[in-house]
Amino acid sequence: MLDQISLEIPKGTIYGLVGHSGAGKSTLLRTINGLEGFDEGELWVDGVDLQSLQGDALRVFRKNIGMIFQHFSLMARQNVFENVALPLRCWKYPEAEIQKRVFNLLSLVGLESKSDSYPSALSGGQKQRVAIARALTLEPQILLSDEATSALDPSMTQSILDLLQTINQELGVTVVLVTHEMEVVKKLCHHAAFLEGGKLLRSGNIEELFLQPDPKMRHFLGESEVLPKEGVNIRLYFPKEVAQNPIITQMARQLSLDFSIVWGKLERFGEDVLGSLVINIPEARQEEAERFLESSGVRWEVL
C-alpha cells in the first residue's frame, strides 16, 4: 500500500523508482497508466487527471504509454514481426503503416535480421528487445519499465540499459523504470525516488541522492562510517561542476593546513565520474577551513 507519495517526474528524463522487495515500486509504476487505482489524492500524467478517465478515454490515454516487463510476455506462436505488430493490429492500422513501423523499430533495437524468428530461438536479451520494440509501436511519449533487466545476465543488462538510453535521447521518450539495482540507477537515471514500506524516503537528482545522502538514505544504502574521535571530520562532495578542480591541494597550500584523509570514493553517474571525500583536520583550524570551502564551490558538511 502506498501512502503520502508526492513527486514530479520531469518530461524527457529517465526516472528511477527504487526500493527493496515490497517497497511499492511496481504498484506506483502501474498507477501511471491506470493499471492500479488509488483511493485518495490525484495523479496527473502529461496534463491529464487520471482519475477523470474511464472507458474509451482511458484506453486512448494508454496509447501514449508503453510498458515492458521482467518476463517479456511474448506470444510463443507468433514470430518477431507479428509480436511487434500486435498493438498496431489491435488498433487497426493500415498494413503499409504496420510494415513501416515494425521494420523501423526492429532496426532501432538491432533485430532487423530476426523478423521471421520465433521467441524460442531468441536469447533473453533479444526477447527483451522485441518487447521494447512492441512497447514503442504506438509512438508513446512515456515508457514504463518494470524490472526489465532483472532476469538478464550482466552483459545483456548493459545492452538493454544502452538501448533505453538511446530511446530516451533519440526519441525524447520519458522512461520510468523500477529497479532494486543501485548500479542501474547510477548509470542510467537522471532522477530517482526511493521507496520504503510504501512511503517516499527521498527523491531528487541522482548526484545529490548518492553523493550527499541524508541519514535515512545512508541507512537505506547500507553505508556505515568509522570516523576518528579526535579533530573535526568534514565530508566533501564533488559535483561535476568542480570535480576536476584541485580544491584539496589548494586548501592545503593556501592555508598551510595538514589534514588526514579518512576515506573517499569515486562513482560513475552516466558519463561523469564523481566522488566524495572525508578529511580530518585539527579543531583549531576548523573555522578557516570552512571559510575556504565556502568559496570553493564544493559541497561539504561537518560530521
From Swiss-Prot:
<dbReference type="InterPro" id="IPR003593">
    <property type="entry name" value="AAA+_ATPase"/>
</dbReference>
<keyword id="KW-0472">Membrane</keyword>
<keyword id="KW-0997">Cell inner membrane</keyword>
<dbReference type="InterPro" id="IPR045865">
    <property type="entry name" value="ACT-like_dom_sf"/>
</dbReference>
<dbReference type="Pfam" id="PF00005">
    <property type="entry name" value="ABC_tran"/>
</dbReference>
<dbReference type="InterPro" id="IPR027417">
    <property type="entry name" value="P-loop_NTPase"/>
</dbReference>
<feature type="domain" description="ABC transporter">
    <location>
        <begin position="1"/>
        <end position="222"/>
    </location>
</feature>
<dbReference type="GO" id="GO:0005524">
    <property type="term" value="F:ATP binding"/>
</dbReference>
<dbReference type="Pfam" id="PF09383">
    <property type="entry name" value="NIL"/>
</dbReference>
<keyword id="KW-0547">Nucleotide-binding</keyword>
<dbReference type="GO" id="GO:0005886">
    <property type="term" value="C:plasma membrane"/>
</dbReference>
<dbReference type="InterPro" id="IPR050086">
    <property type="entry name" value="MetN_ABC_transporter-like"/>
</dbReference>
<keyword id="KW-1278">Translocase</keyword>
<keyword id="KW-0067">ATP-binding</keyword>
<dbReference type="InterPro" id="IPR003439">
    <property type="entry name" value="ABC_transporter-like_ATP-bd"/>
</dbReference>
<dbReference type="InterPro" id="IPR018449">
    <property type="entry name" value="NIL_domain"/>
</dbReference>
<dbReference type="GO" id="GO:0033232">
    <property type="term" value="F:ABC-type D-methionine transporter activity"/>
</dbReference>
<protein>
    <recommendedName>
        <fullName>Methionine import ATP-binding protein MetN</fullName>
        <ecNumber>7.4.2.11</ecNumber>
    </recommendedName>
</protein>
<feature type="binding site">
    <location>
        <begin position="19"/>
        <end position="26"/>
    </location>
    <ligand>
        <name>ATP</name>
    </ligand>
</feature>
<keyword id="KW-0029">Amino-acid transport</keyword>
<keyword id="KW-0813">Transport</keyword>
<keyword id="KW-1003">Cell membrane</keyword>
<comment type="function">
    <text>Part of the ABC transporter complex MetNIQ involved in methionine import. Responsible for energy coupling to the transport system.</text>
</comment>
<dbReference type="InterPro" id="IPR017871">
    <property type="entry name" value="ABC_transporter-like_CS"/>
</dbReference>
<comment type="similarity">
    <text>Belongs to the ABC transporter superfamily. Methionine importer (TC 3.A.1.24) family.</text>
</comment>
<comment type="subunit">
    <text>The complex is composed of two ATP-binding proteins (MetN), two transmembrane proteins (MetI) and a solute-binding protein (MetQ).</text>
</comment>
<dbReference type="GO" id="GO:0016887">
    <property type="term" value="F:ATP hydrolysis activity"/>
</dbReference>
